[in-house]
């Protein structure tokens, strides 16, 4: 029996439509609201279980462009933690970041809610279009950066507890991996089995590759060694908590401090972010025009690197990195320009030293390079219909990416991610820095871009795998002359100075002198390229190492090591290898002077280890290797010396010299104690015909600049397609049979330009230069100061 009475529990629908479960399933029109239950269709079908279909309740979702306001966790009366601020620094780990998002706590235990929110976030278009310009449909962006009072009944989100003590032991083992590799007796015979991490020591320019290849003069090209076991990590943060954690911001006072620190200490030299645009968005607190959350999290990370003490720095950087990486990996930000900016800023995060391939700066530069070339940043945007602001930003980002790519390539001896032969981006000009703030270092960025571009071409011509021996030898001559011309043309504010060196000119000369050592130090195998060197390699490497050690000492004294980027650690590593060779000189004066440099460099490396985790592994290498310590003791002992007349005058001074914590002499006294210095010869002025045109080879410059197309002789016509030649004047492309004579004409002191040329700041000529040069090479080739610690592996190709 069926009832035709209208049910009393059927409320009229807002749109006048409702369906029973059967009609909803069949997707047919239902008249249950009009005739009651059962509906006409169910009565005709004889179904008695006719019921109104109830729609499932939709979870409240919010876009990343329309988040809820951020609030603080209610204070715990038992713990009463102190907030982190610039006014009240705390040595305890920061806990001001345990904030939560209001109105989403009900979804914490429901992973599907998070999935729905993420799907909705991805479906929403970004507030920026693909060119970085503002779109018009962003009125719903209600992002706020002030904290609001929490609801009393809402459960807060708290970070996981601190890690277990075993992680500290694992970190110590990771930092000692280089020591274990060095002191191990059979590191080259260990099989790379499953579960064991392979170590690629790099190629040619890598310091670890250079050290490992010294011991035996064999032909086996081994580049991979067995490392430690692959560590196992557990995810301490649940997947359902990652989204709300990534959208969390710190207290306004701390956020303001970190943002200001970034734009005051980092962005002037690496203008990745347009300061005026970002700060206007950040200060206005306009919900319709808020700064991108991904970019803000990465800026907070870099700001924490340069401001907070170590007790807070590591924790803060881990928090900001976790949030930024989640936002990056889940493609929350749809503007690809911001992805390039974020990837470059994430290079300031120092992950654990157990992985320098899929983490740290090398990894993020590779990602930034892929995105940038995918966007077409490597092509000249002049003729494109770009907004001028975006055109300037693209050029800046491209050349900063070139800088980072070259520096990381020199650090690890790995191929560069960018090939400048495929780029025709016009050189930077001062107009490209409009909107970057009054503190921007335009001179530094322009000249540093020139240096890194030149290094990129030199590395390919000097160290390329398929470069002929003749071309390789000629490239050394051309590189020296190009570098000397570039150095002599630096403006006075960027030249080397004896004291008070700003961090930007310091970074410029650290990279420059690091490359001089890599370019001129001998090959670790005596039989390979034994004639491929110049007559002044020892002086150049020694002077460059002294400059590097002095710059780091100057930065350490003025508390500016925090502004040194990732590659600075490897630059100091290069200098310490050279200084360690000098520790074995038979001349005691030179050995003691090298000991001063080594002590100063060790102090700087210890300070850098406070900021960069990979510096700790190098520090352990020099501090805990038993064989390295034995060589250091030998330097201060009364061992037989070749120069007996100098030995008697200096054997009673090493102990007192070693206690001197002032480190090495300043730049004004480089090598002044090596021997009786004659008057430094004056630098001959460059002739107008030999001036370099430091213009990046582009399609425009090839047609409009006749000097960029050198006239080659018959002996060098096969190299006309090499892009490096466009950086070298035509008279530098000397025929192969006159390379040695031409090299003698270049004064090696031209490679070192100082501000005050009237003082004794240039490296002076050392006594017995011929004997010193021979001894220097013999130490590299025969005594091998570090090869007795390391196993062989094939440092270079065949």
Swiss-Prot record:
Single annotated GO MF: DNA-binding transcription factor activity, RNA polymerase II-specific
Compositionally biased residues, Basic and acidic residues: 632-641
Start-end of Pro residues biased regions: 678-687
GO cellular component term, pick one: nucleus
Known DNA-binding region: 20-50
Name of a matching Pfam family: Fungal_trans
CDD domains from the UniProt entry: fungal_TF_MHR, GAL4
Biased composition (Polar residues): 644-663
Name listed for the protein in its UniProt record: Acetamidase regulatory protein
Native source organism of the sequence: Emericella nidulans (strain FGSC A4 / ATCC 38163 / CBS 112.46 / NRRL 194 / M139)
Gene name of the record: amdR
């Amino acid at each position: 029996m069926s009832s035709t009475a209208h049910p009393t529990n059927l409320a009229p629908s807002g749109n006048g439509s409702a369906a029973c479960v059967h009609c909803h399933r069949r997707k047919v029109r239902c008249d249950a609201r009009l005739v009651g239950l059962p509906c006409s269709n169910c009565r005709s079908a004889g179904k008695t279980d006719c019921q109104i279909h109830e729609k499932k309740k939709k979870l409240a979702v919010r876009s990343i462009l329309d988040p809820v306001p951020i609030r603080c966790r209610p204070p715990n009366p038992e713990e009463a933690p102190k907030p982190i601020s610039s006014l009240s620094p705390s040595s305890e780990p920061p806990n001001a970041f345990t904030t939560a998002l209001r109105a989403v706590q009900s979804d914490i235990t429901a992973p599907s809610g998070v999935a729905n929110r993420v799907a909705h976030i991805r479906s929403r278009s970004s507030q920026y279009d693909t060119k970085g310009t503002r779109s018009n449909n962003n009125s719903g962006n209600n992002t706020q950066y002030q904290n609001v009072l929490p609801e009393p009944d809402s459960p807060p989100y708290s970070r996981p507890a601190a890690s277990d003590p075993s992680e500290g032991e694992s970190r110590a083992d990771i930092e000692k991996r280089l020591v274990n590799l060095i002191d191990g007796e059979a590191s080259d015979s260990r099989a790379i089995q499953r579960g064991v991490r392979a170590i690629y020591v790099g190629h040619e320019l890598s310091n670890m590759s250079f050290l490992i290849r010294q011991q035996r003069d064999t032909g086996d090209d081994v580049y991979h060694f067995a490392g430690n076991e692959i560590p196992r990590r557990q995810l301490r943060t649940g997947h359902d908590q990652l989204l709300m954690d990534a959208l969390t911001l710190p207290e306004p006072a701390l956020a303001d401090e970190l943002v200001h620190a970034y734009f005051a200490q980092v962005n002037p030299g690496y203008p990745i972010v347009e300061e005026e645009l970002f700060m206007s968005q950040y200060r206005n607190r306009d919900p319709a025009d808020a700064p991108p959350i991904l970019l803000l999290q990465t800026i907070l990370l870099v700001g924490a690197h340069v401001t907070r003490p170590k007790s807070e720095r590591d924790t803060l950087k881990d928090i900001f990195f976790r949030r930024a990486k989640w936002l990056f990996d889940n493609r929350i930000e749809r503007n690809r320009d911001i992805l390039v900016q974020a990837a470059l800023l994430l290079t300031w995060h120092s992950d654990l030293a157990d992985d320098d391939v899929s983490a740290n700066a090398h990894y993020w530069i590779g990602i930034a390079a892929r995105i940038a070339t995918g966007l077409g940043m490597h092509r000249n945007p002049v003729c494109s219909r770009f907004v001028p602001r975006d055109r300037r930003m693209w050029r800046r980002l491209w050349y900063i990416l070139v800088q980072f790519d070259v520096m990381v390539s020199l650090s690890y001896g790995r191929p560069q991610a960018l090939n400048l032969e495929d780029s025709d981006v016009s050189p930077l000009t001062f107009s490209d820095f409009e909107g970057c703030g009054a503190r921007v270092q335009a001179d530094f960025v322009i000249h540093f871009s020139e240096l890194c571009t030149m290094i990129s071409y030199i590395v390919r011509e000097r160290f390329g795998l398929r470069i002929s021996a003749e071309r390789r030898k000629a490239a050394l001559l051309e590189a020296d002359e190009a570098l000397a011309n570039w150095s002599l043309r630096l403006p006075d504010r960027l030249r080397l100075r004896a004291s008070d060196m700003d961090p930007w000119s310091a970074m410029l000369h650290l990279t420059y002198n690091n490359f001089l050592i890599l370019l001129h130090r001998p090959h670790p195998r005596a039989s390979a390229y034994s004639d491929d060197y110049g007559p002044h390699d020892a002086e150049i490497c020694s002077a460059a190492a002294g400059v590097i050690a002095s710059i780091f000492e100057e930065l350490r004294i003025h508390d500016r090591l925090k502004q040194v980027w990732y590659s600075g650690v490897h630059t100091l590593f290069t200098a310490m290898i050279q200084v360690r060779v000098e520790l074995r000189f038979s001349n005691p004066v030179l050995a003691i002077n090298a000991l001063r440099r080594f002590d100063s460099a060790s102090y700087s490396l210890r300070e850098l280890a406070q900021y960069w985790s990979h510096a700790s592994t190098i520090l352990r290498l020099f501090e805990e290797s038993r064989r390295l310590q034995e060589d250091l003791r030998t330097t201060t002992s009364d061992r037989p010396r070749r120069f007996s007349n100098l030995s008697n005058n200096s054997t009673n001074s090493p102990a007192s010299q070693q206690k001197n914590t002032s480190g090495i002499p300043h730049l004004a006294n480089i090598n002044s104690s090596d021997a009786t210095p004659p008057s430094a010869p004056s630098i001959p002025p460059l002739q107008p015909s030999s001036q370099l045109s430091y213009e990046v080879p582009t399609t425009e410059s090839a047609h409009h600049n006749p000097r960029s197309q050198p006239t080659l002789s018959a002996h060098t016509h096969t190299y006309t397609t090499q892009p490096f030649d466009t950086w070298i004047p035509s008279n530098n492309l000397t025929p192969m049979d006159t390379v040695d004579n031409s090299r003698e004409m270049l004064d090696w002191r031209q490679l070192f330009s100082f501000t005050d040329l009237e003082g004794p700041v240039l490296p002076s000529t050392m006594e017995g230069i011929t004997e010193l040069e021979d001894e220097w090479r013999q130490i590299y080739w025969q005594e091998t100061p570090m090869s007795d610690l390391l196993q062989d592996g094939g440092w270079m190709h065949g």
